[in-house]
Regions:
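Charged, amphipathic alpha-helical regulatory modules used
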Residues: 1-107, 702-707
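Buried hydrophobic packing segments
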Residues: 18, 22, 227, 231, ...
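Short, solvent-exposed positions on alpha-helices
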Residues: 34, 55-58, 491, 515, ...
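Solvent-exposed, amphipathic alpha-helical segments
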Residues: 42-50, 421-427, 437, 503-506
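Conserved catalytic cores of very large enzyme subunits
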Residues: 86-90, 96-489, 510, 514-673, ...
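Contiguous, well-ordered alpha-helical segments that form the cores/surfaces of helical PPI scaffolds
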Residues: 493-506, 526, 683
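Long insertion/accessory domains within large nucleic-acid-processing enzymes
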Residues: 671-708
């Protein structure tokens, strides 16, 4: 006989546990009210002879109570019922008081290190975290089925963003910025008309970004090409002003020169507005907006030359950096820059190679931009090229009523991630057991994902006018539900995964870079991808496989499994699990081989994936970056460079600030260890982080080896 526990797990029946529970209750009452050993054995025998192959914990508890009452053991039954009720209350009791008070006193280390772009000492950020703690508590106690909540607690799966689940908001999106700029929008009840100049368009764009960020919990992306139209408007405005002012008294060459000077000033000012506004704005999420600028030189666009000018200025300003409070230029975390490589700019003699060369300089100094290969992306997404939503989440192809592909104005409903290493730990190399456990846990993930979906059903557009009424996603009427955007593949649902390396090592004794590990890991990817396709076919919801960034989860899952299963070499003893399908950060492998191997996994993880290579300071060897960029174009859809970009405010050192043997960040020159007196920027997952990291992620960062 098997027992189905409250978290959904099915475990072998152990009658000793029932015997001990009744003995515990016996000890709480006078001897005359106690159950005899004979009665206890009778209860155990009846449970065994019930005839069911699988019993629930609740059903067995009901049987015990019935037996005690039938044998007139009312006092004992009452004690057992009260005990059972108290346990139920305990599971549903408020759990937030201590964590919130510790947060306010700056003593909650776990929360402080949860997000490397949130500073928990700030009152504004604390407000978000306090709300988040309440949301987590309500979600766990009241909103999720108990077995899903238990599965989350036990590290079977991770129900992402529970700190926002009580609100009817979604994860990430591609803003339909073209519609909002061209047709106007409304923010905070104030109409914003279509801009008449580039500077105003940049200002409005940052206002839209802030409003969108405050009404969702994940990242967002803006295709910068839609600003090209407004740069041309500024050029036309300046030309008309000169014509009105000087008429024929100035020759055309002089007029063109003045127009170009004024346009350059406006271009610089507009881009500066975007960079500084995004890095200084504080959303209701207690942080700068998680936003990506998509830099795509699309020659089919009539404003392509204006787009090139904007991209060049964005890259120039990013190379310069932003000033910290000491007035020193440092690497900003936002906005994330994603640059598209195509036939016209892939460093093979294309028309726009000069833009890519500037992008390479920028990556060498500031880590961004990251690179998308249009060539590989078209192979994966029915000939289309489009931005990720924020860090790495990609939409599935969808066509409107006219048969046209649509990307902007779509979104992701949410993410649930599966703990692959835990399955490997429990399977102990037995493939039959592995696939059985994977099946069971995928069904739990599906149920958890449907909780997210159902939480959005019936939501009306009024909850976020910027999204639903004024163009970021749609132009619905007030009071209209958002339901039509939740079905038929318009928006996506993500099944995330973490620790493919650890899972492979546990099952095959090697990494996924060699056989038999690689074949097994790819089979697991195919299996989970196919399961997403099956769910999509059954529900009409666009489920997709997503390589989880795992900023916090890399530590959380590893910590849970270490507590449950002890130190396991190369798995739990490291203190972290590896991001998604990535090669073990400690493995000595060159950049080209790493990208080549990981590209096979990227192609199966089309709901979200990004690969990186760790490089030294290459500001004096940009040609090495360019060589890898050429390789990215032909071999992998989405790649990025990790380098170091640090500054010690005590001594002025601007080399790499190291992690010492005590896992402390320390300036190698003056030995400063004060986080408040140093600027450290590292690749956290797909985004950069600059507010330091949890213990697991810090260990992972320290363990990274160079690939060039």
């Amino acid at each position: 006989m098997k027992i189905q526990k409250r978290d959904g797990r099915v475990v072998p029946y152990e009658e000793d546990k029932i015997r001990k529970a009744i003995h515990k209750a016996n000890n709480e009452v006078e001897e005359r009210y106690r159950a005899s050993e004979g009665l206890i054995e009778e209860i155990l025998e009846d449970v065994q002879q019930e005839g069911r192959q699988t019993q629930t914990v609740e059903h067995i508890q009901d049987m015990i109570e019935e037996h005690l009452v039938e044998h007139n053991k009312y006092t004992l039954a009452k004690k057992y019922i009260v005990y059972r009720y108290q346990r139920s209350l305990l599971r549903k009791s408020n759990t937030t008081d201590e964590s919130i008070l510790k947060l306010i006193r700056n003593e909650n280390k776990e929360l402080a290190e949860e997000n490397s772009n949130k500073n928990t000492r700030l009152a504004s950020t604390q407000r978000d975290y306090i709300a988040g703690e309440v949301s987590r508590d309500v979600t766990r106690r009241l909103l999720l089925p108990e077995h899903i909540a238990m599965a989350h607690d036990n590290g079977v799966l991770h129900f992402h963003d529970a700190d926002y689940f009580i609100q009817p908001i979604f994860n990430c999106c591609l803003i339909n910025i073209k519609d909002m700029l061209d047709n106007g929008t409304s923010i905070n009840g104030k109409m914003i008309e279509s801009p008449k100049s580039f500077q105003v368009a940049c200002t409005v764009t940052t206002q839209i970004i802030a409003a969108v960020a405050s009404n969702q919990y994940g990242g967002q992306s803006v295709n910068i090409k839609h600003l090209g139209k407004y740069l041309r408007k500024s050029r036309e405005k300046f030309a008309k002003q000169l014509e009105d002012e000087f008429g024929d008294t100035l020759d055309q060459a002089a007029k063109d020169k003045i127009v170009q000077m004024r346009l350059h000033d406006e271009l610089k000012s507009g881009v500066q507005t975007i960079q500084y506004q995004i890095n200084t704005l504080m959303t209701t999420n207690g942080q700068s907006p998680f936003v990506t600028l998509f830099l795509h030189i699309d020659e089919n666009d009539e404003y392509v030359e204006e787009t090139v000018q904007i991209i060049m200025e964005i890259l120039r300003q990013r190379i310069e950096g932003t000033k910290n409070e000491k007035g020193v230029y440092v690497t900003p975390a936002f906005p994330k820059l994603v640059y598209v490589l195509d036939e016209n700019n892939c460093l093979k003699g294309g028309k726009y190679d000069y833009v890519t060369k500037l992008a390479a300089q920028c990556s060498a100094k500031r880590m961004y931009p990251d690179y998308i290969s249009a060539k590989k992306m078209r192979e994966n997404y029915e000939g289309n090229v489009f931005s990720c939503m924020g860090c790495r989440s990609f939409l599935s192809p969808w066509k409107d009523e006219n048969g046209e592909y649509k990307w902007e104005g779509r979104f992701n409903q949410g993410v649930v991630s599966i703990n692959l290493p835990q399955i490997g730990i429990l399977a102990k190399g037995n493939e039959e057991k592995f696939w059985k456990l994977l099946d069971e846990r995928l069904e739990l993930c599906y149920e958890a994902l449907m909780c997210r979906h159902k939480a959005l059903e019936g939501v009306v557009s009024d909850v976020s006018p910027i999204h639903w009424q004024y163009g970021a996603i749609a132009r619905l009427k007030k009071g209209e539900t958002i339901d039509k955007y939740l079905h038929n593949g318009y928006s996506t649902m993500s099944l995330g995964y973490i620790g493919l390396y650890e899972m492979t090592y546990l099952m095959k004794g090697c990494s996924q870079t060699v056989e038999p590990g690689k074949e097994f890991a790819l089979r697991v990817m195919d299996y989970t991808k196919d399961r997403c396709a099956k769910w999509k076919e059954e529900t009409g919801i666009a489920f997709s496989l997503y390589g989880t960034p795992a900023e916090t989860l890399c530590y959380r899952f590893a910590r849970i499994d270490r507590e449950k299963y002890g130190d396991i070499s190369n798995v739990t003893d490291k203190g972290y699990y590896t991001n998604s399908y990535h090669v073990d950060v400690r493995e000595k492998i060159d950049a080209f081989t790493k990208f080549k191997i990981e590209s096979e996994f990227q192609n199966k993880s089309l709901g979200g994936a990004i690969s990186y290579v760790e490089v030294p300071n290459l500001t004096n060897n940009v040609e090495a970056i360019e060589e890898v960029i050429r390789f990215i174009y032909d071999n992998i859809q989405y790649g990025e460079f990790n380098t170091k970009s640090d500054y010690c405010q005590v001594c002025g050192y601007d080399g790499e600030i190291m992690i010492n043997d005590n896992m402390e960040w320390e300036c190698p020159q003056c030995h400063n260890k004060d986080h408040a007196k140093m600027n450290v920027t590292r690749r956290t997952c797909g985004y950069l982080g600059e507010n330091f990291w949890n213990a697991g992620k810090t260990k992972e960062i320290k363990a990274r080896v160079l690939h060039l």
